Amino acid sequence: MLEKLIERVLFATRWLLAPLCIAMSLVLVVLGYVFMKELWHMLSHLDTISETDLVLSALGLVDLLFMAGLVLMVLLASYESFVSKLDKVDASEITWLKHTDFNALKLKVSLSIVAISAIFLLKRYMSLEDVLSSIPKDTPLSHNPIFWQVVIHLVFVCSALLTAVTNNIAFSQKERH
């Protein structure tokens, strides 16, 4: 009897995630606001914007879109996995969610982080002259911010690859048993 009570209480604690999911949806609102603000800024300066600034603005919008997609994916998958099934929604609208288990979500998050990091590096590459001109010529590599940004990006790439390999090994072993 005590065991059943403990199990029910523990299982009911999943609903503590629901307010967090709702709060996380506010992050989407903020990202949407920033996206629209950046888009408006780009459109309002269309006559005077340089090609480089246009590309940088577009990359910024893509970055915000990736981030919003990442937030939405984690939000929906977390709710579906840990709180409650999304049974009120047309199943054809969220078919990807039915195939997203925790391991697939980890991989998608890892790949999204790599994509966001790559966009950040591409934006830095587009303004490379400005960045390099602000660094003294005799600065050691360990003090160069671009060096560390590339290193961090490579860590993200390696992490995503290791996640994919680990998932692949785990799923292939699961299929054998």
UniProtKB/Swiss-Prot annotation:
Membrane topology: Multi-pass membrane protein
Compartment list: Cell membrane
NCBIfam families reported in the protein's UniProt record: HI0507
Protein name as annotated: UPF0114 protein jhp_0175
Position of the signal peptide: none
Keywords from the named record: Cell membrane, Membrane, Transmembrane, Transmembrane helix
Annotated GO CC locations: plasma membrane
Annotated TM spans: 15-35, 54-74, 145-165
Main localization (coarse): membrane
Family in the record: Belongs to the UPF0114 family.
InterPro entries assigned to the protein according to its UniProt record, in alphabetical order: UPF0114 (IPR005134), UPF0114_bac (IPR020761)
